[in-house]
Amino acid sequence: MADTSVQKLAAEVGKSVERLIEQFSEAGLKKGQADTVSETEKQQLLDYLKKQHGADKAPTKMTLQRKTVSTLSVPAGGGQSKDVKVEVRKKRTFVKRDDSELVDQAELEAKAKAEADAKAAAEAKQKADAEAQAKAAAEAKAKAEANKAKEKAPQAPAPKPKAELKAETPEAAAARAEAERIKATQEAVLTKKQKEEAAQAAEEAKKLAEVNSKRWAEEERLRLEAEKNGDHHVTTSKVARAAEDSSDMDDEKRGRRARNKPTNKKRGGKDARDGREKHMRNRSTAPQSMAHGFNKPVAAVSRDVRIGETVSVAELAHLMAVKATEIIKQMMKMGSMVTINQILDQETAQMVAEEMGHKVVLLRENELEEQVLGDRDDNVKLETRAPVVTIMGHVDHGKTSLLDYIRRAKVAAGEAGGITQHIGAYHVETDNGMITFLDTPGHAAFTSMRARGAKATDIVILVVAADDGVMPQTIEAIQHAKAGNVPLIVAVNKMDKPDADPERVKSELSQHGVMSDDWGGDNMFVHLSAKTGEGVDELLEGILLQSEVLELKAVREGMAAGVVIESQLDKGRGPVATVLVQSGTLRQGDIVLCGLMYGKIRAMKDENGNAITEAGPSIPVEILGLSGVPSAGDEATVVRDERKAREVALYRQGKFRDVKLARQQKSKLENMFANMEEGEVQELNIVLKADVQGSLEAICDSLTGLSTAEVKVNIIARGVGALTETDATLAAASNAIMVGFNVRADAQARKTIEAESVDLRYYSIIYNLIDEVRAAMTGMLAPEFKQQIIGLAEVRDVFKSPKIGAIAGCMVTEGIVKRSAPIRVLRDNVVIYEGELESLRRFKDDATEVRNGMECGIGVKNYNDVRVGDQIEVFETIEVARTL
């Protein structure tokens, strides 16, 4: 290869001339910009560069990473959508080429280019020579044929041309031939170059197809699977690639615009906003290749909606695949106002779903509870058990006194005020067998407790005082007995009194469906006296006779089951529950499930406080060891596993909480508009603590029943046990009164009560508690005012006074006229002015009041149109005490 200049070599290797001269200088060769470089000098420079950088040295690399994040909105079911973040990561590696490689590459490229040019020139010359020879031969042949034809053709006189054509000179012919040859050579080179480019493009396309064939096949397989399975997430890769390509194009466009656009000064205000808006309009958005995930059905879709015990509006909408607003509209049509987070009970949710055309499947969420309660080793052998007898009747009709005589113990003295406020459960051994008695309170407030007693009993004894007859609680007891389908025995008490009238009792009871067996009815009547014991033996015989007719039997061996009669929180013993065993045998150490509570029985005591280890059917017993205070009336069941008992108790607590919340929300929504219309209602806040659960429920029901449209009793906290410091703090913060029923406040609570001046009241009789709360509510009523006329004066004459104006000379015809009282001026019995007196005189002296039949002068303040014949009415406003 011929020598080349330094400048040309620098252009070939892609370096600046100064850098190349510097490298020549480092290699020991002094070169200038116009000097030539021989092959030997090139080789010497290449050897130096290889030695300097190392022949096997790895090239320097630089890796750049770029991460772009985009967000896709995909359907999530139920008419909702969710956002999915797509993150695209790109990695690019740049390799720094070595100088020796650049020199080798430049040398090879130059050599290849020279060889290609030489080869192309030789081929072009050869082709041009061949074409010239062929053209010359063709011209010679054509000329010979033309001469031959000319000789054969007859001579004809040729027309005389208008202008003689100039003959072509040899120099012009040679120039034209040379131009045609050069043109043909260029066309040949261009054609060859196009063929080479086409072949190279085909080769590259073939290589690209080989590289991408596997990836295309995999994408096609994934697409077919996605169409088959309906999975929309597979298309995320397509959208991500489209977003990436779009982002690359945006970056390239922004860079090109930034390079081409001249720099302007910073703009502000409207120009800047216009520019930003235009930029946002011109921005290209990523192509959305994902198809819509939901097509609106042309017909109504009926789904199987699985509904549990409780469900919120949002969850129900998701189950039915509709928007929550549709359910809210449907419930508004049904007359209920709900919110999206409101809890619906199973019945309401079922009604809504069926109204909207769906099939409802009610879930049994208490399968675990049924499994635990069904796993019992009950003995199928039934044995006769003692009857459970409930004594009912009106207050002070002698129920507890009757039971006291039967038990030979003074129980009535232990109850405050001589009335029963707890359910007393006792079993009595008689000569004819054992009988279990439940003594229920007779006060109206204990309706729920009495209803509980009727559910747990076999026979009801209705005690009616012979001197008092049928009373409201007597009628209520009859209703409870009939509702429980329990046989009724009437005990006509207080027969020792002189004014006793048993026939009147029979007549009054017959009006309520209780007919004596003497009158052809089904109910046994026993005349007795709890004070003298007259007729008590006949009553016991009647009870045992009735129990034989009922054939009362129960399983004696096996796991026990019963009902909670009463419960309380004892300060030393913890939660204590009185349980009436109905079947099986309850033993110390058993795992008991009582309503929302559970526990292992640590101790058992009978009604007299004696420790026992087991209790059979129809035996009342106190048990200790529960996790909390159960509600009276809950079923008590012995289970095998304490862990499963705990799970069932927690499930019941959650279910109770959900149902309670649903009930509260329903009450709030129903009363919302009523409260708006009625205005502000006075509230009497109460913190209530009682000794036992039954008394607590009865007091709460009674106090809640006292609420009126103007004053509402709000029991902000209730519980069983002593009043604690927490209760006192809550009462102080809520401006509430603290009420203790048979309980007292501890030392810390008393300190807080004194410091915060909280109103604390103790009660042992429910009458007094209700009466004082009613009095407190009466004091909270809005005052009522009434106008009372105290005097009337008739105008007989009118005088003019320069200081006051018109003075009415009057005669007091009724009552008394007071100086400080407001007045009305009446004309023809029509009120024309209402105001107050400015002066009241008797003769020339000022007077504070003028009585009936006396004359006086009256000056009306700010009113001068007093005429003869008018009447001046004097009145005063008094406050009238209101009652509930």
Swiss-Prot record:
It comes from the Bacteria. Keywords: Cytoplasm, GTP-binding, Initiation factor, Nucleotide-binding, Protein biosynthesis. InterPro entries: DNA-bd_dom_put_sf (IPR009061), EF-G-like_DII (IPR053905), EFTu-like_2 (IPR004161), IF2_assoc_dom_bac (IPR013575), IF2_II (IPR044145), IF2_N (IPR006847), P-loop_NTPase (IPR027417), Small_GTP-bd (IPR005225). Residues 110-153, 193-234 have a biased composition (Basic and acidic residues). Residues 493-496 are annotated as: G4. Pfam families: EF-G_D2, GTP_EFTU, GTP_EFTU_D2, IF-2, IF2_assoc, IF2_N. Residues 418-422 are annotated as: G2. Residues 529-531 are annotated as: G5. Residues 110-291 are annotated as: Disordered. Residues 439-442 are annotated as: G3. GTP binds at residues 393-400, 439-443, 493-496. GO terms for cellular component: cytosol. Belongs to the TRAFAC class translation factor GTPase superfamily. Classic translation factor GTPase family. IF-2 subfamily. This is Translation initiation factor IF-2. The gene is infB.
